[in-house]
C-alpha cells in the first residue's frame, strides 16, 4: 500500500454556503489575461477570502458572509466592462476548483517561517531561506490541484525587475508586478511608480528553480515539496473541518523490482567506444573555450586509455564527440547542433551542462558519454541491443514499441535475439513494410492520452502506456521522526511506492512507477516519480513481462528509467532521422 498525491475530498455544501459567498467572474473575451488586475483586485481591495484562476475565461472568488458583498457591488468594484459576475452555490463549483478555494485561503494564516501568497489566482509558498543573499531572487512553491484532483507542488522564481536588462520588453511588461511587504508577503503593485522595486514571476534564463521533493536530513526534511503538500492537507482538516475533509488516496502495490539487470553496462560501453577511433571537434567560435576543450579531451583520453584525435581517421567507423553550447545559448543564434551529420556516431557535450560536472563528478559524466555513444552505435551500425541481453526474456516472437511525435509515427521492432529494425510513417499516405504497424498507427490516433507509447507483445496483446499526474507521497509520520534512517525497513514503512520500481493496482486500473533506487539511495529525492498508466487496447496486460526493462541505468545514469528501455532507442532514432 502506498499514498498518492490524489486527493480524496468530501464537502459539506450546506455549511459552505451558509458561511461563504462564491462568485464566478467571466470575461467576454476569449480568456482572462494572466496579468489581469481582476486576479488580484478582490484580494487586495475588497477582502476576498481567496481567488482561483485556471487559465481560461473565468475566475472564482470566495467571501465571508460577514463581509457580505452583493453581485452588483462586486461588479462595480471590478470596474471592467468586459467582465460579468454571477453568484453560485458551492455545489456548482467543480471539486478541484472548490478545494483550491480553501487551499488558497490559507494565505490568511501565514506564519513567520512560511508565507502563503494568493496572488494572480494562484497560491505560492515562500520561506526566508529561499531568498537569495542580495534579495533579487525568491524561490517559491506553487501549489495547485489539477482537474483529476492530483495535488501538485512546483518550484518557481520571483525575480526583481532590476535584474532584467531589457526592462521594457513586451514579455516583461505583460507580467503582473508584486511588491514584497515588510512581513515577507507579496502584494500587487497598485501603480507603475511602485514597480521599480517590484518582482515578477519569471526566472533568469538558464537558471531553473529547484526545490527537492523530499530531503532525508533531520534539519531539512521540513523544507521539501512533499512536506508542504502534507502540511496543507493537515491545515485544511484542522481549520475547515466544518466544511470538508481531505486526505491523500491509497493505492495497492502488486509487485516491486529492486534489482538492476544491467550491472555491466559501463564495461560494455567502454569496450564499445574503445574499439573505435574517437575524435573531438569544437563548434565554438575559433579558439573559444580551448582550455575547457583540452581538459575534456584529456579526461576522455585517460578514461579510454587511448588518444583522442582531432579529426576522423576512418570516417566509416570513427565516433565523434562534439563540443558546443547548450540549446538555451543558441535560442537567437544559428545552432550548429541542427547541422551535424547523423550518418555516424556523434555525441554532443555542452560547455554549460557538462564541463563543470566533469570536475565535480568526472566518472558519471564520462560513463554517460560512452553509454550514449554505444546506443547510437547500436542504432547506426549494430542493429542490436548490446547493453542488455534481450534474449534472456525468452520471448517467442517480435515485440513492437511505437510513439508519435509532431504527427509522425515511429516504431521499433525487436526480434527475440535482440536484433531490431525501425520504421516510420510521415503523412497520411506513409507506408510500412510491416503490415501490423498500420493497426498500431491507427490505435495511436484513436487514444487521447498524455505522452502515450504503444506496445505489441509476442502474443499479439496491445497495451498503451501514458503519463499521469499521479505520484507517491511519503508516510506523513516521517516528518515527525527524531532520527531518520534509509535502511530497508524504513524505506518500506515511510517511502513505499517512492523507491524502486512498483506495479500498482487501483480498482482494476494498472499503473507503475520507476522511483529512486532504494539500495544506497542519497539523502535527497529531487523529483517525485510519476505513475504511468497501462491501458489494455487488445488482449491482456503485458507490463509485468517487461517491468524489468525499467530496472536499467544505461538510459539515465544511476537511475531507473521511467519507460521500457526500447523507448530510449526509439527516441534516439527519432533525433537521428529528424536531423537528417
Segments from the language model and where they lie:
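Long, contiguous domain-sized segments
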Residues: 1-239, 243-252, 257-261, 280-580
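Membrane-penetrating hydrophobic segments
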Residues: 263-272, 310-311
Amino acid at each position: 500500500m502506498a499514498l498518492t498525491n490524489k486527493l480524496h475530498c468530501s464537502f459539506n455544501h450546506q455549511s459552505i454556503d451558509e458561511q461563504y459567498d462564491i462568485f464566478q467572474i467571466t470575461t467576454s473575451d476569449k480568456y482572462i489575461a494572466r496579468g489581469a488586475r481582476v486576479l488580484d483586485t478582490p484580494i487586495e481591495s475588497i477582502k476576498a477570502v481567496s481567488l482561483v484562476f485556471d487559465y481560461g475565461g473565468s475566475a472564482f472568488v470566495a467571501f465571508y458572509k460577514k463581509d457580505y458583498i452583493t453581485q452588483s457591488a462586486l461588479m462595480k468594484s471590478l470596474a471592467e466592462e468586459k467582465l460579468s459576475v454571477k453568484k453560485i452555490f458551492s455545489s456548482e463549483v467543480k471539486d478541484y476548483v472548490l478545494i483550491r478555494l480553501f487551499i488558497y485561503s490559507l494565505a490568511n494564516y501565514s506564519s513567520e517561517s512560511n508565507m502563503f501568497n494568493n496572488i494572480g489566482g494562484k497560491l505560492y509558498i515562500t520561506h526566508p531561506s529561499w531568498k537569495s543573499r542580495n534579495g533579487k531572487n525568491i524561490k517559491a512553491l506553487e501549489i495547485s490541484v489539477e482537474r483529476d484532483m492530483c495535488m501538485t507542488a512546483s518550484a518557481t522564481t520571483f525575480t526583481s525587475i532590476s535584474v532584467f536588462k531589457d526592462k521594457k520588453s513586451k514579455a516583461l511588461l505583460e507580467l503582473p508586478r508584486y511588491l514584497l511587504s515588510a512581513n515577507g508577503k507579496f502584494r500587487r503593485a497598485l501603480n507603475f511608480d511602485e514597480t521599480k522595486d517590484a518582482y515578477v514571476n519569471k526566472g533568469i534564463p538558464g537558471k531553473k528553480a529547484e526545490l527537492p521533493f523530499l530531503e532525508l536530513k533531520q534539519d531539512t526534511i521540513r523544507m521539501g515539496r512533499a512536506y508542504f503538500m502534507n502540511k496543507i492537507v493537515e491545515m485544511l482538516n484542522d481549520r475547515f473541518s466544518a466544511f470538508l475533509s481531505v486526505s491523500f488516496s491509497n493505492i495497492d502495490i502488486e509487485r516491486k523490482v529492486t534489482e538492476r539487470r544491467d550491472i555491466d553496462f559501463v564495461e560494455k560501453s567502454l569496450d564499445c567506444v574503445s574499439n573505435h577511433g574517437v575524435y573531438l571537434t569544437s563548434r565554438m567560435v575559433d579558439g573559444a573555450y580551448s582550455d575547457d576543450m583540452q581538459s575534456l579531451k584529456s579526461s576522455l583520453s585517460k578514461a579510454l586509455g587511448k588518444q583522442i584525435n582531432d579529426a576522423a581517421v576512418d570516417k566509416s567507423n570513427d565516433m565523434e564527440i562534439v563540443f558546443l553550447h547548450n540549446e538555451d545559448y543558441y535560442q537567437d543564434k544559428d545552432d550548429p547542433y541542427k547541422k551535424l551529420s547523423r550518418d555516424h556516431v556523434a555525441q554532443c557535450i555542452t560547455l554549460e551542462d557538462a564541463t563543470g560536472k566533469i570536475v565535480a563528478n568526472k566518472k558519471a559524466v564520462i560513463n554517460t558519454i560512452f553509454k550514449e555513444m554505444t546506443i547510437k552505435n547500436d542504432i547506426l551500425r549494430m542493429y542490436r541491443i548490446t547493453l542488455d541481453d534481450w534474449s534472456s526474456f525468452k520471448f517467442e516472437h517480435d515485440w513492437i514499441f511505437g510513439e508519435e511525435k509532431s504527427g509522425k509515427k515511429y516504431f521499433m521492432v525487436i526480434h527475440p535475439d535482440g536484433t531490431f529494425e525501425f520504421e516510420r510513417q510521415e503523412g497520411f499516405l506513409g507506408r510500412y513494410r510491416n503490415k501490423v504497424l498500420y493497426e498500431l498507427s491507427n490505435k495511436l490516433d484513436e487514444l487521447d492520452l498524455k505522452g502515450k507509447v504503444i506496445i505489441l507483445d509476442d502474443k499479439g496483446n496491445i497495451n498503451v502506456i501514458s503519463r499521469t499526474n499521479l505520484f507517491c507521497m511519503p508516510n506523513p509520520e516521517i516528518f515527525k521522526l527524531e532520527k531518520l534512517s534509509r535502511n530497508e525497513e524504513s524505506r518500506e514503512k515511510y517511502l513505499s511506492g517512492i523507491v524502486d520500481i512498483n506495479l500498482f493496482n487501483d480498482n482494476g486500473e494498472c499503473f507503475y512507477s520507476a522511483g529512486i533506487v532504494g539500495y544506497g539511495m542519497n539523502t535527497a529525492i529531487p523529483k517525485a516519480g510519476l505513475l504511468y498508466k497501462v491501458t489494455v487496447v487488445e488482449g491482456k496486460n503485458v507490463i509485468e513481462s517487461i517491468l524489468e526493462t525499467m530496472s536499467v541505468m544505461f538510459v539515465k545514469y544511476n537511475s531507473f528509467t521511467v519507460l521500457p528501455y526500447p523507448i530510449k532507442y526509439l527516441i534516439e532514432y527519432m533525433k537521428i532521422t529528424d536531423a537528417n
